[in-house]
Regions:
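Conserved AMP-binding/adenylation subdomain of ANL enzymes
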Residues: 192-209, 217-258, 273
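AMP-binding/adenylate-forming catalytic domain of the ANL superfamily
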Residues: 134-135, 438, 462-486
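Conserved pre-ATP/AMP-binding loop-to-beta segment of ANL
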Residues: 16-17, 131-173, 179-180, 203-209
C-alpha cells in the first residue's frame, strides 16, 4: 500500500498494537485508535478549513501523540501537510508558509504557552495566517461526530476510498544551514519506497520499539522515527525534544527502547548521563545529519553500543546509505540503499572525490514552486566510494576554501582540532584574506585554546601551512538547529565579525 493512510489501515488489519504510539505526557494510542481518531479529527477539521481549496495545511506541534493523530487526519482527508520548524524564527517560518501557499496552521494553545511562543504566533498572525487550535476542535466535538466517525471507520477499513499517491503527502523544509530553507514536497511514493529501502537494509523486525526525539519537522524524525515504525507495525515512544540531555538516556532505559536515531552533536551531550544499563535493550543506534567523530564512536563502544552511521537528505525522503550490523566500515556512512542510482562528478582542483548525484523513486525531481525538473539530484556533497561500495562524505561543496589556488576541505581540517581536543566542538570557517584569497578561522568551545600548540600538532600530523587556522575564536555555546545540525550560517557571521 503506497498511500500513507492506506498503509496505516493495512498495518492495523494484519498486526494490532495496543500502544503503537506513546509519549512522555502519558498519552498513548493503538493503531486502530489512531485510525478512528484521525477520522474523527479530520471530519471536524473540515469545518475550520474555510475556502482552503487544495492548499497544504500547516502543522506546528511537538513530538506528542496528538501530533501523530493530526498528521494522519490530514492523510485521511488526502491533504498535504506542511510541518513547520517552530525553532527557526518568524522570518524563516513566514518564508516557508508563503512558499507553500499555506493559509491555516494547526497548533495547540497549551504548546504555545509552554513554549513561550506567543510573540512568534502574533508575528505570524499579523501576516494574515490563521491558526486552528486543537482546544477549539475539541470544543466542537459532539456525540453525533463520534457516531459518524465510527461509521466512517468501518467504511475505511473495508472499503477504502481511492486516494492519490502521486501528490505530495508532506512538505518539509531544508535545514537552512547554508542558505534560506527550500520547500521539499515528498509524495506518498517517495516515502513508501524509502521506507522499504530502509527496512530491507537494516532488517528491522516488528518487535522493535523506537525512541524518537528528533522532531517531526526533521526528515529523519518524521520518515524514520515515526512513519517507518508506525507503518511497519513497531511501537514508538515520542519525546518532545532531543535537548533534554540528562533525561533522555534514562527514558531510553525505562521505556526499553531498542531503536534510537540521533546526531553526533546530541550523542556527545548524552555521554555524561549514560549509565551501565542505559542501552541494555538497544539493538540499533543510528546517527545521521552530520559526521560522527571518532571520539563519539569510541565513547559509545565503551557502553557496548556500535553506532551505525548513515547518510541522507530531506530530498531523498530521507535515507540514502547506512552501515548495518553485517556491512560496516567505521568512518563511512555505509552502502547505498537498494535501488538508488548514483554518479560522482569530478571537480576541477579537487584532489580526492567528487560531487555526488543521486536518483531513485525516493528522490524528488524538483523543489516546491520550481517547474524545472532534474534527472539527477545534486546533493552538494563531495564524496568518494571505496572498492567495496562504502560511501565516505568528504565535505559539503560549499564548505571548501580556496587558499593560494588550492581547494581546502573545511571538514577535513576540522578532524585535527577534534583529535587534539576530543571532548570539544570545533568548526572551521573561511574568511577573506588579502594575500591568499581566503584564510581559515577555528571556532571552538575549548576554553583558553592555544592556536600555536594546535598548529604545531597539525604540522606534526603532516599538514601544510595552507591547512592551518590563522585565527581562533572561543564560543561557549554553539548555535544548533532544531534538526541537531550546527548552524553554519550563524557561525560564518561570527567568523566574519
Amino acid at each position: 500500500m503506497v498511500h500513507l493512510y492506506q498503509s496505516l489501515i493495512n498495518t492495523a488489519k494484519f498486526g494490532y498494537q495496543s500502544k503503537i504510539i506513546e509519549d512522555s505526557l502519558s498519552n498513548s494510542v493503538s493503531n486502530l485508535g489512531l485510525i478512528y481518531k484521525s477520522i474523527l479529527l479530520g471530519n471536524i477539521l473540515l469545518r475550520f478549513l474555510i475556502n482552503n481549496e487544495d492548499r497544504p495545511i500547516g502543522l506546528l506541534l511537538p513530538n506528542i501523540v496528538p501530533t501523530a493523530i493530526v498528521f494522519f487526519s490530514t492523510q485521511y482527508l488526502d491533504k498535504t501537510v506542511a510541518i513547520i520548524n517552530f525553532t527557526s524564527g518568524s522570518k524563516n517560518i513566514t518564508s516557508c508558509l508563503k512558499k507553500s501557499n499555506i493559509k491555516y496552521i494547526i497548533t495547540s494553545r497549551k504548546f504555545i504557552n509552554q513554549g513561550n511562543l506567543e510573540p512568534l504566533i502574533k508575528e505570524i498572525e499579523e501576516k494574515s495566517y490563521k491558526f486552528i487550535y486543537l482546544e477549539d476542535i475539541k470544543e466542537r466535538l459532539s456525540l453525533k461526530d463520534k457516531i459518524i466517525a465510527i461509521k466512517d471507520f468501518f467504511l475505511n477499513i473495508f472499503m477504502l476510498k481511492k486516494l492519490n499517491t502521486d501528490k505530495n503527502a508532506v512538505i518539509l523544509y531544508t535545514s537552512g544551514t547554508e542558505s534560506d530553507p527550500k520547500g521539499v514536497g515528498l509524495t506518498h511514493q517517495n516515502l513508501f519506497f524509502n521506507r522499504m529501502q530502509v527496512l530491507k537494509s537494516l532488517k528491522i523486525s516488528k518487535k522493535e520499539k523506537f525512541f524518537t526525539c528528533l522532531p517531526f519537522f526533521h526528515s529523519f524524525g518524521l520518515g524514520i522515527g515515526v512513519l517507518l515504525p508506525v507503518l511497519h507495525g513497531c511501537k514508538v515512544f515520542l519525546y518532545p525534544t532531543p535537548l533534554h540531555f540528562q533525561t533522555i538516556p534514562k527514558i531510553i532505559e525505562d521505556t526499553k527502547s531498542t531503536v534510537f536515531f540521533s546526531t553526533d552533536t546530541f550523542l556527545k551531550k548524552y555521554i555524561p548521563y549514560i549509565k551501565k544499563n542505559t542501552f541494555k535493550n538497544l539493538n540499533y543506534l543510528i546517527a545521521g545529519a552530520e559526521k560522527v567523530d571518532q571520539s563519539t564512536h569510541s565513547m559509545y563502544k565503551k557502553f557496548g553500543v556500535k553506532i551505525l552511521e548513515g547518510y541522507g537528505v530531506t530530498e531523498a525522503s530521507p535515507a540514502i546509505s547506512v552501515n548495518t550490523k553485517d556491512n560496516y566500515k567505521i568512518g563511512s556512512v555505509g552502502k547505498f540503499m537498494p535501488n538508488i542510482d548514483y554518479k560522482i562528478e569530478n571537480i576541477e582542483s579537487y584532489d580526492e572525490g567528487g560531487l555526488l548525484y543521486i536518483r531513485g523513486k525516493n528522490v524528488i525531481t524538483h523543489y516546491l514552486n520550481q517547474s524545472k525538473k532534474f534527472d539527477w539530484y545534486n546533493t552538494g556533497d563531495v564524496v568518494r566510494v571505496d572498492e567495496d561500495g562504502y560511501l565516505y562524505i568528504l565535505g559539503r561543496l560549499k564548505r571548501f576554501a580556496k587558499i593560494a589556488g588550492e581547494m581546502i576541505s573545511l571538514s577535513q581540517v576540522e578532524e585535527f582540532p577534534k583529535k587534539f581536543w576530543p571532548n570539544n566542538i570545533s568548526v572551521v570557517c573561511s574568511i577573506k584574506d588579502n594575500e591568499k584569497g581566503e584564510a581559515l578561522i577555528l571556532i571552538t568551545d575549548k576554553k583558553n585554546p592555544d592556536l600555536q600548540k594546535l598548529n604545531s600538532f597539525m604540522k606534526d600530523e603532516g599538514l601544510s601551512n595552507l591547512y592551518l587556522p590563522k585565527k581562533i575564536k572561543f564560543l561557549e555555546e554553539f548555535p544548533i538547529l532544531g534538526s541537531g545540525k550546527i548552524d553554519f550560517k550563524k557561525l560564518q557571521d561570527i567568523a566574519n565579525s
